[in-house]
A protein has these predicted regions:
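Single conserved hydrophobic/aromatic residue that forms the stacking wall/gate
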Residues: 1-7, 11
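Generic beta-strand/beta-sheet core signal
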Residues: 4-5, 42, 76, 93-95, ...
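Solvent-exposed loop/turn segments at secondary-structure junctions
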Residues: 8-9, 46-48, 99
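Extracytoplasmic/secreted cell-surface and envelope-processing proteins
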Residues: 12, 49-51, 102
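Active-site-proximal segments of metal-dependent phosphoesterases and phosphodiesterases across multiple
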Residues: 12-26
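Extended C-terminal subregions enriched in glycine
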Residues: 22-56, 63-83
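Short low-complexity, flexible loop/linker segments enriched in glycine and/or proline
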Residues: 55-58, 90
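C-terminal regulatory/interaction regions
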Residues: 80-113
Length: 113
C-alpha cells in the first residue's frame, strides 16, 4: 500500500483529524514544478507536512507549486483503491465548478483504468 499514506479511516476517527500529516518536501515540489506538471496531490488533508519541518518556511509545497508556478494542489484524494489494485497508470478526469474568485473548490476527480 505504498501509494496510500494519508487519510484512510481518519474520517471515521475524528480525534485524529488535523493531528498531523506526512507530505512531500520543498525539494519534491520543486522537482514536480521543473517537470511542468499541471497539478500535484496527495491523499492527506494537507499537501505539505504538518506540522511543518521548518517553522521559518512552512508549507513549501503551497509556495512553490501554487504561488510561484501556478500548479494546482489536490488534497484529500482517495487513492487507497488504486494502491490496493496496484494501478499506476490511468486516465485522470477532473471537473470543477466555475466559481469566480474562488481559491478552494470541492471537486470530484475520477481515475479510469
Amino acid at each position: 500500500d505504498d501509494l496510500s499514506r494519508g487519510l484512510g479511516d481518519v474520517y471515521k476517527r475524528q480525534e485524529l483529524w488535523g493531528s498531523g500529516t506526512p507530505g512531500p518536501t520543498g525539494e519534491v515540489s520543486s522537482f514536480l514544478a521543473s517537470k511542468n506538471v499541471v497539478a500535484a496531490g496527495a491523499d492527506t488533508w494537507s499537501y505539505d507536512v504538518v506540522p511543518p519541518i521548518d517553522l521559518n518556511e512552512p508549507y513549501p509545497g503551497h509556495q512553490i507549486l501554487l504561488k510561484e508556478n501556478g500548479i494546482y494542489i489536490l488534497e484529500a484524494m482517495s487513492t487507497g483503491e488504486l494502491a490496493k489494485d496496484n494501478v499506476y497508470e490511468f486516465l485522470f478526469v477532473l471537473g470543477q465548478a466555475k466559481v469566480r474568485g474562488a481559491v478552494q473548490m470541492i471537486i470530484n476527480p475520477i481515475a479510469i483504468n
